[in-house]
């Protein structure tokens, strides 16, 4: 496969991930929200209901993070094939501390099979060091926009953060 030589200044890729657990009052399905930034510029966003009903916030946040990791992998491949260098690991921000911690611990054991599959996908990316999972408090998580209706104060704060 002929790939172009990497040229130019390396770009920084980051992802904000969030899930609204059981936010749909009719079906109780969760909602995923993702925002992908390239050098602090929003280049992609994703907002969609999840296909399964989750019994825990951990499960819905893990599904959201796995969706984000899949999108990041596709973006990294596109940038790689265009010869755009990437500056280290992609920063992935999530507002659930337990999801962040389990993504970083290889000895974690999960009992639900579908959660374990999503976890291993995230864990493989973290072990390969092409993502770095970090905690982002819910008050400043930009992907919160895409999952639920926010109070006016929080919405203004996130909009201000997004536009600066």
Give the ranges of each region predicted by the language model.
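Amphipathic alpha-helical
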Residues: 1-5
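RNase H-like nuclease fold core
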Residues: 7, 12-58
């Amino acid at each position: 496969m002929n790939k172009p030589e990497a040229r130019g200044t390396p770009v920084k890729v980051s992802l904000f991930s969030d899930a609204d657990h059981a936010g749909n009052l009719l079906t109780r399905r969760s909602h995923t929200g993702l925002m992908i930034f390239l050098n602090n510029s929003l280049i992609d966003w994703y907002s969609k209901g999840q296909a399964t009903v989750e019994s825990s916030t951990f499960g819905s946040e893990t599904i959201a993070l796995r969706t984000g990791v899949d999108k990041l992998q596709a973006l990294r491949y596109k940038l790689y094939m265009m010869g755009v260098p990437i500056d280290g690991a992609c920063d992935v921000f999530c507002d659930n501390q337990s999801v962040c911690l389990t993504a970083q611990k290889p000895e974690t054991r999960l009992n639900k099979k579908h959660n374990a599959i999503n976890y291993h996908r995230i864990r493989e990316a973290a072990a390969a060091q092409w993502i770095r999972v970090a905690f982002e408090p819910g008050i400043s998580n930009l992907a919160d926009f895409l999952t639920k209706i926010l109070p006016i104060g929080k919405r203004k704060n996130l909009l201000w953060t997004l536009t600066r």
